[in-house]
């Protein structure tokens, strides 16, 4: 499945992609270049899988304290629909910046890999699936999507719900567009910046 294999690499600036891929190929055989560092970041599955799975299983996480199988017990069809909806939003944002759109089912990828069946859930809500993947994953992605005019109602909802569960403002965490140096860029300026630096 393309989301897991091969390892995707984005280069900043993208105009140096061939040079970087050539240098890395001997160390990481089978790597795949993507259009930009943003497209690479938006293709990360951790926030797409962890955040909806953890938010929809928060009660189970608190009760079981890690004694349940996250990817089998926690990933029913309704959870998978939310994963796919959020994945779609990140794909549309990546496509808007010039990246490829993934069409693979995340649930099928998880079900098709026996290694996922062994993984137990987080033991509490202080786990990195919440504390990192919400503010540094989907909250930052949603900010980027807003910058280029892409709505992210699913991501925004999950950031809000995560804030309630964690008793914090998850939307204020993560990276701001100002910290990334792209706050005042329109879509064309952002595309040019990603290619040329």
Q: What residue spans do the PLM features occupy?
A:
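C-terminal substrate-binding/catalytic lobe of Rossmann-fold NAD(P)-dependent dehydrogenases
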Residues: 41-135, 139
């Amino acid at each position: 499945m393309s989301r897991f294999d091969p390892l995707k690499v984005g280069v900043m600036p993208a105009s140096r992609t061939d040079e970087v891929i050539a240098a890395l190929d001997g160390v990481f055989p089978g790597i795949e270049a993507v259009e930009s560092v943003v497209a690479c970041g938006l293709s990360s599955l951790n926030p797409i899988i962890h955040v909806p799975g953890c938010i929809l299983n928060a009660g189970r996480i608190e009760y079981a304290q890690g004694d349940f199988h996250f990817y089998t017990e926690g990933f029913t069809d309704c959870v998978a629909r939310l994963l796919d909806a959020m994945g779609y939003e990140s794909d549309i944002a990546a496509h808007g910046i010039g990246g490829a759109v993934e069409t693979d089912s995340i649930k099928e990828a998880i079900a098709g890999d026996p290694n996922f069946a062994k993984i137990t859930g987080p033991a509490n809500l202080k786990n990195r699936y919440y504390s990192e993947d919400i503010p540094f994953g989907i909250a930052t992605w949603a900010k980027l999507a807003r910058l280029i005019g892409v709505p992210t109602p699913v991501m925004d909802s999950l950031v809000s719900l995560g804030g309630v569960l964690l008793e914090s403002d998850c939307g204020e965490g993560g990276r701001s567009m100002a910290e990334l140096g792209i706050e005042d860029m329109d879509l064309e300026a952002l595309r040019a910046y990603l290619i040329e630096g």
